[in-house]
Amino acid sequence: MQESQTKSMFVSRALEKILADKEVKRPQHSQLRRACQVALDEIKAEIEKQRLGTAAPPKANFIEADKYFLPFELACQSKSPRVVSTSLDCLQKLIAYGHITGNAPDSGAPGKRLIDRIVETICSCFQGPQTDEGVQLQIIKALLTAVTSPHIEIHEGTILQTVRTCYNIYLASKNLINQTTAKATLTQMLNVIFTRMENQVLQEARELEKPIQSKPQSPVIQAAAVSPKFVRLKHSQAQSKPTTPEKTDLTNGEHARSDSGKVSTENGDAPRERGSSLSGTDDGAQEVVKDILEDVVTSAIKEAAEKHGLTEPERVLGELECQECAIPPGVDENSQTNGIADDRQSLSSADNLESDAQGHQVAARFSHVLQKDAFLVFRSLCKLSMKPLGEGPPDPKSHELRSKVVSLQLLLSVLQNAGPVFRTHEMFINAIKQYLCVALSKNGVSSVPDVFELSLAIFLTLLSNFKMHLKMQIEVFFKEIFLNILETSTSSFEHRWMVIQTLTRICADAQCVVDIYVNYDCDLNAANIFERLVNDLSKIAQGRSGHELGMTPLQELSLRKKGLECLVSILKCMVEWSKDLYVNPNHQTSLGQERLTDQEIGDGKGLDMARRCSVTSMESTVSSGTQTTVQDDPEQFEVIKQQKEIIEHGIELFNKKPKRGIQFLQEQGMLGTSVEDIAQFLHQEERLDSTQVGDFLGDSARFNKEVMYAYVDQLDFCEKEFVSALRTFLEGFRLPGEAQKIDRLMEKFAARYIECNQGQTLFASADTAYVLAYSIIMLTTDLHSPQVKNKMTKEQYIKMNRGINDSKDLPEEYLSSIYEEIEGKKIAMKETKELTIATKSTKQNVASEKQRRLLYNLEMEQMAKTAKALMEAVSHAKAPFTSATHLDHVRPMFKLVWTPLLAAYSIGLQNCDDTEVASLCLEGIRCAIRIACIFGMQLERDAYVQALARFSLLTASSSITEMKQKNIDTIKTLITVAHTDGNYLGNSWHEILKCISQLELAQLIGTGVKTRYLSGSGREREGSLKGHTLAGEEFMGLGLGNLVSGGVDKRQMASFQESVGETSSQSVVVAVDRIFTGSTRLDGNAIVDFVRWLCAVSMDELASPHHPRMFSLQKIVEISYYNMNRIRLQWSRIWHVIGDHFNKVGCNPNEDVAIFAVDSLRQLSMKFLEKGELANFRFQKDFLRPFEHIMKKNRSPTIRDMAIRCIAQMVNSQAANIRSGWKNIFAVFHQAASDHDGNIVELAFQTTCHIVTTIFQHHFPAAIDSFQDAVKCLSEFACNAAFPDTSMEAIRLIRFCGKYVSERPRVLQEYTSDDMNVAPGDRVWVRGWFPILFELSCIINRCKLDVRTRGLTVMFEIMKSYGHTFEKHWWQDLFRIVFRIFDNMKLPEQLSEKSEWMTTTCNHALYAICDVFTQFYEALNEVLLSDVFAQLQWCVKQDNEQLARSGTNCLENLVISNGEKFSPEVWDETCNCMLDIFKTTIPHVLLTWRPVGMEEDSSEKHLDVDLDRQSLSSIDKNPSERGQSQLSNPTDDSWKGRPYANQKLFASLLIKCVVQLELIQTIDNIVFYPATSKKEDAEHMVAAQQDTLDADIHIETEDQGMYKYMSSQHLFKLLDCLQESHSFSKAFNSNYEQRTVLWRAGFKGKSKPNLLKQETSSLACCLRILFRMYVDENRRDSWEEIQQRLLTVCSEALAYFITVNSESHREAWTSLLLLLLTKTLKINDEKFKAHASMYYPYLCEIMQFDLIPELRAVLRKFFLRIGVVYKIWIPEEPSQVPAALSPVW
């Protein structure tokens, strides 16, 4: 009831107000009066009925609505502004409060609803510019209410009409308030239209969700839930939630919906199904609509009033729509306009045409009429924005320009507020492609700044929200507009500025930047947008060709800054994109004990914060169901990029030389080899130069013809007009200039055309088509070439083609139509190609600003044509768009553009002093370094770091006095990079640390601390400038060269100090220090690089001969302290570098430097040793190695002394913690042991003595690994001949070490180390005894006699004392060491030294060896007897009589001492040994040697045979070296000139003779025991003298020698030796001639040589053995052989004796005859018979010689025995028989 009364009140008052108007009373308004009166009467009647309660509240019906609306319609049609205003106001309120819904059918127009008629009536109230301003405002209010009201629905044409009317009011109204209100209303309407469309989909999604949530899911519902439509709707809902507005937009991230728009969206979001109406209304709906209207109108009026008189008031709306392009305000729009009727009519007609023509088609594609509404409005706005501007300079107040601007602004608003449906629905995407993008291609090159600016803003929005669907359109916009404007030299500053402002936003979005690279640069068919963009920005940032652009220097600088800002943003995006790969060293630690402080964390976040604040990554836009997406595979894209580069290079080659390009592409596998493949390539690849394509196809070569045929055959001319076919044929290339080439092409074209159109009847043959095609080409040239003045007429053309159709004419109408078509449009290449070529060809230098503008306008026009053609070409195309997600894209991106980026930053830093430019360049370099670091791109990283270092001026050759603020900032940046990217810097640390080093020097010089660096050495006299040259050369690298070399005055110094003053600030000093303190947080590889380059810089600092600096050396010490707590693996790698550096520094020729190094080493070592060391680790060994190196290489006594003292201090204070370090300690002392400085030797020996005697007592297990080094060290002390007392004491300590090994074998056995291949049982030997004994042998071999004798004694004492603990195989090793003593004899040395060695050491050693062997025979005989025999043989064979005698003596002693333990095998070996010695020492040369050239003297045949009674052993023997074993040929001519050779030979022969004699004696002593034979001979003599043999009886039965232990075979071997020796000596003694020759040659001396002693002793020994065996019952089995041997030997001996002429010779044989006869007499009768019968004749002969009485007595006994045995004589009385004749058995 209340509602009805309210409505009645509105209507009544309005009608009464209309009737009351005096205008209504005029006659022409009679119908209006009647309608008003009728309506009032009905209202009164209705109210009366309601008051009386006679009827229920009436429901709205169609007839009633008609009655109510008719007076208002008539009122609106009246010409009275007041009446119209009143009517409109009432309608607006009725609609706003829901009193009119308009759902009733329109009685006057079937198929329409009343609301459509109402809206049409409201719109008709606007009659153009002359419409009353109040009426205009009421129209705007009414229409906004109609669109926004929740009570009514208007769609399609009606809603389009409301928008059009407001649009026209904005254009036509002269009132600023109305204009602003109309514009705001338009924005609000669009907001409502598109919001309702989005909310409708949300509503559907909610309705789909309700049954799913409330009921158990059936299979059908489940299928629906996962259907694409449902998923899309649900996704759309999620995307449009107001709770997630954080998404960053390319349009500066603001949300363009106005507050009023939000209100209307929230309160008007109850969409209904098609055609439905609301059954009820919200209580507050009317108030809400009222508020909206009041807000819109009030705010519009207020803003217009505030800005009255200012330019472009609609920019307020622009601000609401988030446009932020910093271009100065544009033009005034307050002027009056004309021609609105035309404009409105064109709008209406266009839109009506669209609505009528496409109504059903469009509606069929939309799921709701709201979507169609939005589509129609959007399309209309696009078409409005495409309307061309008038000719000439654009008028800011013209309808065309204002229409274009507002349409673009509204489009921008729509796009910025686009919801999920608009962003994903295929119809809207297609609308954007077909209408908006084409519109942008025209407006995007507009010369009007506002239009251009809006176009850019729209493009930004498209790029932000729609790039998934607009891949190819975005490419066109970039390639043909953005980049062309940047590249064109004639572009205006305003256009460049706006483009680069837009690029600033694009480049600040990481997702967008990476997407551009992935989708264009990595697409085979797309342009390299990213690469080209960066290159263009780089050129702008470098400020090239600035003066040619018509810009002021300030404008150029602004542009440079923006270019740099874009480049920096791109790198920031890359950093942001790859941030997950970055490890900040300041947020971790490599030391377990350390943690970051809050201050350090804060300090380290600089770059991170800057990076994070740059821009957040864009979210991926939602793709529609029809959009193709590609999987993001970085490796695949990289492969594509490589292929693309190959193709581009091939195209580049083709455009120079086609065949070469084709060949290259085929070689790379990018192009097939068949002609069809090549033809297809020519068709598809638009980047090919069209002229080159034409020339290639027209060439006469066979291959070219085949390609051309394939090219034409791939064209389809079916059912095409001839001219159209020809156009298609010629659009892909430019016709070549040669007529023959054209002829070939036309011939093939004609053939192909006829082939495709075989059913045609126009052409008689292909010849006709060929001639006609040729004539068309000629016609095109004639009509369209500016060179042709007189153009061909149609008649002339027809005449020219007479008779070409098989001698007949083609129809004139046909030829005429061809002429007209060609006249209207020439035949040319494809428009995109033609325009692109035209654009590129117009680039030229301009002479004036006017010329530049004209040329630029021409270029912009061509650009627009190209862009429009390309946009239209791709409007229906679909291209897959990849939304990049992988981090790995950044690496190839950066690799592609790092060089132009570096060029831009370098030139910016070098040429521009602007602080903002420098700041941008430095920030860019920082980001570039970060990227290069993260992806391990060493070349790129090093290049950027070197650039920073270069611009710091710290390493440049220019004077450091030129340092400016940018250079200071560069230094700070370099320090920051070191701090934040240290983990990745690698070799780049070199540049950074070099700069830090030079920075420290600059600080010192700048603060006056070290001005001596500028004036040479401080030792020079004052005022001298001689040092300048040196200092200048020294610090050229610092940039001090120019400052120094020219001398230093006060002004220069002041300037210098001022320039480097800031580098000495606390912040810089702290930052530098933080690099070193922060080294603990570098990872394991980075710290090694850091240390390596710090050491390299330190070496450079120390390289100065005059002023070495120790800054870096000090830092090395510091970081060693800081990093000492790292894990051992890392620390060992660090110390490997630092230790090597200390090696070099410790040997620095400058003593101060070396002292500092050694002292630093000491401090570090003490700290390191405090940590201790676990078993089997070797870190101490590595750490202390520099001391060892310094001792080895540095000969400075000061440094060596200091090193020894440092080690001594460590030993005294840290002995308990030292493990593997003992090796280095002993190595250092080993070096000191050989020093000539007594103090060094004494100090080292004292510490060594302390270690061995004291520390080993307590820490022996820890030092086992170095025990060998300790012994070696002592050995070195012992070998220092300059300090004999130390030598003896050292040997004593070695003996002392043996005590440790003996007492602690278990410790040695249990010790495990690197030599794990040593068996536990052998460790005592390998680590204990062997080193001791080996070093003693070294002492023996190296030292002088007293020391080596002591060493020899100690060595054998140790053997004898501890040998019982040795294993058998240890003895083998030991004797190899012992035998090394004799190895010294094998070296060529001085004769005197060798002789001394043989007679002392070797002699001593031989006897000692035999003693040890005897002592430990059981252990040694199996393993070492052969070696000992071999060694004895070697000694015997030496040319040293003493050694030879000692060898035989030792052999004798060895056998006598141990023979009773010998096995038969050992006796075999022993006998073989003696046999070998015998054979090798027989001096056969004595019998054969002859002096060369000496003739035999016959007088010498009868020589005096008197011999001296002295034995051969008394012959004068000269000391000799080991001589030759063989004599040279007697015929050698060199004998006369080489007497020394003879002496050497004779000495050797003498020694052999001595050895033979010694060996005979040795055999005798071994078999019968020493002195037994002599005693026996003496007894025989006595017996002979006494004429009795009784004394011999007891000797026969006592065998003290080895006889009883030797087998007969062993004895036979010895007998062979003896017999051979006897035979040789007998032969020599009998050869008087040879003896004379030798005597004359100097052999023997004064008397003739003889071997009488050898002759007799060998035979005597032989006889004794044989006779002993002959009577030995145990050898009965060998008696026969013995007897045979005995008979032979004795017979030969007696026979020889008879032949001897010399009395002295016979005298020497006396004892032999006594022995022979005496022994024979002692055998039994049976055996005696055999002997007597053999000897008898010889004995009879002997009787004739003058014999001594003893021999005659024995002969007498022998003959008496013969008589008895042979019974010649029988004694009468036994008592009378001589004792000799009594039987012995």
Swiss-Prot record:
UniProt GO cellular component terms? asymmetric synapse; axonemal microtubule; centrosome; cytoplasmic vesicle; cytosol; dendritic spine; GABA-ergic synapse; glutamatergic synapse
Positions modified as Phosphoserine?
214, 218, 227, 277, 348-349, 614, 617, 700, 1511, 1513-1514, 1525, 1528, 1534, 1782
Swiss-Prot/TrEMBL GO biological process terms: endomembrane system organization; endosome organization; exocytosis; Golgi to plasma membrane transport; intracellular signal transduction; positive regulation of tumor necrosis factor production; protein transport; receptor recycling
Which region ranges are annotated with the description Disordered? Answer: 232-285, 1514-1535
Tissue-level expression reads: Expressed in placenta, lung, heart, brain, kidney and pancreas.
For this UniProt record, the keywords arranged alphabetically read as follows: Acetylation, Cell projection, Cytoplasm, Cytoplasmic vesicle, Cytoskeleton, Disease variant, Endosome, Golgi apparatus, Guanine-nucleotide releasing factor, Membrane, Phosphoprotein, Protein transport, Synapse, Transport
Q: Name one Pfam family in it.
A: DCB
State what changing residue 209 to K does.
In PVNH2; uncertain significance
As stated in the Swiss-Prot or TrEMBL entry, residues carrying the post-translational modification N-acetylmethionine are 1
- Entry's Gene Ontology molecular function annotations: GABA receptor binding; guanyl-nucleotide exchange factor activity; myosin binding; protein kinase A regulatory subunit binding
Region of interest called DCB, as start-end residue ranges on this chain: 2-224
Q: Where in the cell is it found?
A: Cytoplasm; Membrane; Golgi apparatus; Cytoplasm, Perinuclear region
* Activity regulation information from UniProt: Inhibited by brefeldin A.
Q: Which parts of the sequence are annotated with region: HUS? A: 508-528
Q: For this protein, what post-translational modification is recorded in UniProt?
A: In vitro phosphorylated by PKA reducing its GEF activity and dephosphorylated by phosphatase PP1.
What happens on changing residue 794 to E?
Answer: In a breast cancer sample; somatic mutation
Oligomeric state and interaction partners are given as: Homodimer. Interacts with ARFGEF1/BIG1; both proteins are probably part of the same or very similar macromolecular complexes. Interacts with PRKAR1A, PRKAR2A, PRKAR1B, PRKAR2B, PPP1CC, PDE3A, TNFRSF1A, MYCBP and EXOC7. Interacts with GABRB1, GABRB2 and GABRB3.
What is the disease in the record? Periventricular nodular heterotopia 2: A developmental disorder characterized by the presence of periventricular nodules of cerebral gray matter, resulting from a failure of neurons to migrate normally from the lateral ventricular proliferative zone, where they are formed, to the cerebral cortex. PVNH2 is an autosomal recessive form characterized by microcephaly (small brain), severe developmental delay and recurrent infections. No anomalies extrinsic to the central nervous system, such as dysmorphic features or grossly abnormal endocrine or other conditions, are associated with PVNH2.
What is the protein name given in its UniProt record? Brefeldin A-inhibited guanine nucleotide-exchange protein 2
Species of the source? Homo sapiens
